[in-house]
Amino acid sequence: VDGVRRTWESTWSNPRDVLLLFDIDGTLLLKASREHAEALHAALRRIHLLEEIPTGKIEAAGRTDDAIARSILTLAGVPAERVDDRARDVRAMACAEYQHRCPADLRAHLAPGVPEVLDVLAARPDVDLALLTGNLDCIARLKVDRAGIGHHFPRGEGAFGSDSEDRTDLPEIARTRHGTARGEPPYPRERTVVIGDTPRDIACARADGCHVIAIATGPFRPSDLAGADVVVDMAREIPAALARIPGLA
C-alpha cells in the first residue's frame, strides 16, 4: 500500500518544488503562549466546571491543544468519555476566549530573523509555505495574523491541533490539503520539510516520512534535537539548511 501511495504522490506536476511546514510557538513566535494557555484553561473550567486547573505536571511543548486538554482533564478526574463528548465545545470556547485575550500586535514576539526569512522563502518559485502546529486552527491563524506574517500561509492549507489530537497525523493532513488546493494528489513526503523546535516536531515528521529542520529557539538544546536532518540556531539559517538535505538541492 505504501509503495502505491508513494507512486501516486510522485505524479505531482512539479516534483522539484518543496513544501515547508512551519510550527508556530518556539519557532515563528517566542513567548507568545500565555494568553493561549489562559484561553484553554478558561474553556476547560467553563465546559467541565473545574475550580482549579492541575497544570503542574503537564508538558505542553510540541503537543496539540486537544492532547494538553486531555492530560489536564485526566488529572482533574474527568472521565475519558466526557472528555471526548465535550471536546468540540472546549475547542469552540477556547477559540472564543482567545479572541478576547490575544494581544492586538504580536510582532514583538517574532523570533529573530523570521520576517526576513519568510520573505526570502516566499519569493522562491520552488517553495510553498504552510503551517503545521498543535494550536487549534482559529488560534493559530490569529497568532500569525497579529504577528504580521499570516499572509505567507494560505488559508485552508496546513494542519492544526483541531485536525487531530495526535500530532503525528498532521504532516499527512497538510500534504493532502496542499495537493487538494491545487487539484493534485497529496504533496510528496520526500519533498516536504517540517520546521519546528521540539522533539515532537521531529517525531511527527519522521512518522510521515518527511524531512525535518529543527530550530533551537525553543526550550530544547541542539543535542535534544539531534534526530532532525539539520539543526539550526536561528531562522535565518533555514535556506542554507534546505540545501544541506540530500535530494532537496
Regions found by a protein language model. Name each.
Residues 23, 130-132, 195, 215:
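Short hydrophobic segments within beta-strands
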Residues 3-61, 67-74:
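Active-site neighborhood of HAD-like aspartate-dependent phosphohydrolases
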Residues 37-41, 65-66, 70, 91-95, ...:
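An amphipathic alpha-helix signature
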Residues 8, 21, 99-131:
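Short, acidic loop-to-helix structural element flanking the phosphoryl-transfer center
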Residues 71, 76-99:
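Active-site phosphate-binding/coordination module
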Residues 1-18, 81-83, 107, 115, ...:
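Asp-based, Mg2+/Mn2+-dependent phosphohydrolase catalytic module
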Residues 57-61, 133, 162-163:
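Active-site nucleophile and cofactor-binding loops and adjacent substrate-binding regions
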